[in-house]
A protein has these predicted regions:
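Polytopic alpha-helical membrane-helix bundles and their juxtamembrane interface segments
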Residues: 2-136
């Protein structure tokens, strides 16, 4: 294995472990917040549960497969995801400021999307840059 292949494999595993951990943390937070009888917190919990399940699954499958990804392909995926994360943040502001929907529930969903979207924006951008810098 070349030095670059080892670095790609290490970064990919690191990325998957962080995403899996974030997903599990979000699921636990989502379940915990479900016990509160407040619309804002219930809506926040739904967002944490949905995003948590998706992030957990996206993180666990690469760990199970344990394969070495194509660097360019992974970089492109992370770049596209970074742009999607910006869209998630725009949607979160529409919900928080009640531009589309009204009520405490909309604000809770907005903050849920904002928290998850901010994490993913930093995460996807950081790892996208890291994968881009590795030479073929």
């Amino acid at each position: 294995m070349s030095k670059n292949t080892i670095e790609i494999s290490f970064l990919h595993r690191q990325l998957a472990m962080i995403l899996t951990s974030w997903g599990l943390t979000s699921i636990v937070m989502g379940i915990t917040l479900l016990f509160f009888d407040v619309d804002f917190l219930r809506s926040l919990s739904i967002q944490f549960l949905i995003w948590g399940i998706v992030n957990f699954l996206l993180g666990i499958f690469p760990l199970i497969r344990n394969s070495i990804p194509n660097r360019k392909r992974l970089y492109k995926i992370l770049l596209i995801n970074s742009f999607l994360d910006v869209i998630y943040l725009i949607v979160s502001f529409l919900l928080i400021f009640q531009i589309v929907f009204q009520g405490e529930s909309a604000v809770g969903h907005g903050f849920g999307v904002m928290i998850q979207g901010l994490f993913l924006l930093v995460f996807d951008t950081y790892y996208g840059i890291r994968f881009k810098r590795i030479e073929d």
